[in-house]
Amino acid sequence: MITAEKKKKNKFLPNFDKQSIYSLRFDEMQNWLVEQGQQKFRAKQIFEWLYQKRVDSIDEMTNLSKDLRQLLKDNFTVTTLTTVVKQESKDGTIKFLFELQDGYTIETVLMRHDYGNSVCVTTQVGCRIGCTFCASTLGGLKRNLEAGEIVSQVLTVQKALDATEERVSQIVIMGIGEPFENYDEMMDFLRIVNDDNSLNIGARHITVSTSGIIPRIYDFADEDIQINFAVSLHAAKDEVRSRLMPINRAYNVEKLIEAIQYYQEKTNRRVTFEYGLFGGVNDQLEHARELAHLIKGLNCHVNLIPVNHVPERNYVKTAKNDIFKFEKELKRLGINATIRREQGSDIDAACGQLRAKERQVETR
């Protein structure tokens, strides 16, 4: 729930007259109801309408009194997203471009796997991290999303899957934006979708990825929720990583590894390192050896990513044969590594590409 204190702390949050009802955790809904002179058990009924029956309006909550429904309508909104574009790949990947209440646009992706359906969600409108290979940073950061706007992405995809009686089984927080720059809303989102009164998606089926905001890695290590953790690394040496990711100038590789060591000491959980391969930049065997040396001894997995071409960026994709060589070298050196399967290659699959095409919506 967005409080005055949260707004003061997070200047990039929106200032709507009504916040999304999906921004409330179950305990917050209970507390709010009590403050309004309502019975606490109504929270369970409201959450059932929102997350199990997945209604589109408060008026559909027919086991609530008229007065309570009006109270909810006076304080909250249910509809926060409008689908602007929906692109479907021949491999089943679906990319959504959603418009928010204030006209900004965000992307969400449904990816189909043998083991279930995964949704990649966005946490910010734009991004200020400035990774030089990413379309999401084009145009900078406009604002942070409310927790409810992140929840609504998952719910909208789930509603689309309801027609075929399928279920969202995994969530990855790897869409537009840096999740750790919208930390409190991200954590509320995680607690909401993980709650058994809500979507009840297991913590171990949710992954959050960061570019390396070190203070927040320490905070995340101290949380009481066992979410999977990934770090966008992309290079083992500061010179190369700073070229790809300017955030490295503030939080260098050495300090990043120290934070990850703390995370593992606290949680005893594996970390995934995401490593995008860029032709002639970080994809040689010497780079594989540098990477292996850096992360040796950590409980980790390396996810090698064949990069998507972004027209506004100059990087080129590494040849398939070189990707296999890179993976083989890591394995030879004792590092657990796999190559990420490419999905949605026939649509605007790179993070931020679809939104970049529609960005005139935001530059009114």
UniProtKB/Swiss-Prot annotation:
Compartments annotated for it: namely: Cytoplasm
Query: What EC number(s) are associated with this protein in UniProt?
Result: 2.1.1.192
Q: Name one GO cellular component term.
A: cytoplasm
User: From what superkingdom does this record's organism come?
Assistant: Bacteria
Bridged cysteine pairs (disulfide): C120-C351
Annotated signal sequence is none
Q: Where does S-adenosyl-L-methionine bind?
A: G177, E178, S209, S232, L233, H234, N308
Similarity section? Belongs to the radical SAM superfamily. RlmN family.
The protein, known as: Probable dual-specificity RNA methyltransferase RlmN
**What's the source species for this entry?**
Staphylococcus aureus (strain NCTC 8325 / PS 47)
